[in-house]
């Protein structure tokens, strides 16, 4: 088999480059799984202001440290819930923030967020045009489907993806449910993951048996089962 034939040449490659050479070949890869926020679509600072806007919509007092409290409760919710539900999340905010937050709070909040996207990125569109001509592309994101689909459409990249998998339909990453669905109809060695969060995207994919591309400019971790890229556009060099 090709693995045995390549083993003789292993001295010419570092261990990382060897794994990458073997798994990065377009003769093997058939599907690419993408994370969404901070991977395909940059995170805007204005998104934080949408919390205050939602408080104001419901006439809920917004105190000086409100966002930090809200953010911590959101982290706790994500930590303790494998699957997301808007009404359940709204109640979790109400019970843990201690204010009269209605059951439709998250509906309104995510509605604001879904309309807030950066200007279209022509370079990203060019990359996705190239990748979608060679591979099946899928999004796997730990958030709500209606918001993420809206963002993909507004950003002008929805058409490039065959599936949008979200954590209101499947247990969130790094659990295996979303990876299982994303790999349906493919062998694991035919699928790679691209993401910016080590725990949910990269380690989750590795634990499931996938090779990954880790989008980061600050994390110095390296490994045999993932390749670090500093820009999403770097994928064109490898896939």
Features from the language model and the residues they span:
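Asp-based, Mg2+/Mn2+-dependent phosphohydrolase catalytic module
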Residues: 2-13, 18-32, 125, 129, ...
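Active-site neighborhood of HAD-like aspartate-dependent phosphohydrolases
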Residues: 21-69
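Conserved strand-to-helix beginnings and helix N-cap segments that scaffold or border functional pockets
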Residues: 44-47, 121, 151, 176
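An amphipathic alpha-helix signature
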Residues: 47-55, 86-91, 145
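A metal-dependent, Asp-based hydrolase signature
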Residues: 60-61, 75-109
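Surface-exposed cleft-lining segments at the edges of enzyme active sites
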Residues: 110-117
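Structured helix-beta-strand junction loops
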Residues: 133-134
